[in-house]
């Protein structure tokens, strides 16, 4: 996750929420054995075309040496999501250049980028499908670790995010 999530709550102040969101992400990642790297930018302070932001993501990519990248859809609803999508696209290429200056020497491989569904899958036509039947339970357990965000989505947007994930996942299963 690129953002601290510091603005995403009705009651919890930003500094406190930053800590909570980082702990929730670490807990969720721990369920799947994932090292969580993130919280590089405050909410609504992520802008595409920003070299410093791109360079932070270049460092993450060069550090992780991924086999593939999953990022936000370029047409998502949230300005941070669309900016991250573009920054990841740009950084994924820059990270492959051996002479591109960064905190890591080893260049990353040029790998596929996969875009997630935007919120509720609106106006998105997948070109590839992955059967997540065996992982949906873990996915939901990981999602439920993000308690402060689930509460925020319910209170701010009226969205039961857990139900939406189940519904959208089932729909994509039928679709393929």
Question: What do the PLM-derived regions correspond to, one by one?
Answer:
Residues 12, 48-176:
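Metal-dependent de-N-acetylase/amidase catalytic core
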Residues 1-64:
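Active-site rim/loop-helix segments in enzyme catalytic domains that contact anionic ligands
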């Amino acid at each position: 996750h690129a953002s601290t999530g510091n603005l995403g709550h009705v009651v919890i102040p930003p500094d406190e929420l930053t800590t909570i969101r980082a702990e929730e992400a670490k807990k969720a990642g721990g369920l799947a054995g994932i090292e969580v790297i993130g919280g590089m930018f405050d909410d609504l302070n992520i802008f595409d075309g920003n070299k410093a932001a791109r360079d932070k993501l270049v460092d993450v990519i060069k550090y992780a040496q991924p086999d593939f990248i999953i990022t936000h859809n370029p047409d998502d609803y949230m300005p941070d999501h669309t900016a991250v999508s573009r920054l990841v696209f740009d950084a994924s290429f820059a990270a492959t250049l051996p002479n591109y200056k960064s905190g890591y020497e080893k260049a990353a491989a040029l790998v596929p980028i996969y875009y997630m569904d935007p919120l509720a899958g609106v106006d998105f036509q997948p070109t590839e499908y992955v059967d997540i039947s065996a992982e949906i339970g873990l996915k939901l357990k990981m999602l439920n670790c993000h308690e402060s965000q689930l509460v925020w989505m319910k209170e701010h947007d009226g969205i039961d995010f857990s139900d939406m994930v189940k519904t959208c996942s089932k729909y994509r299963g039928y679709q393929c």
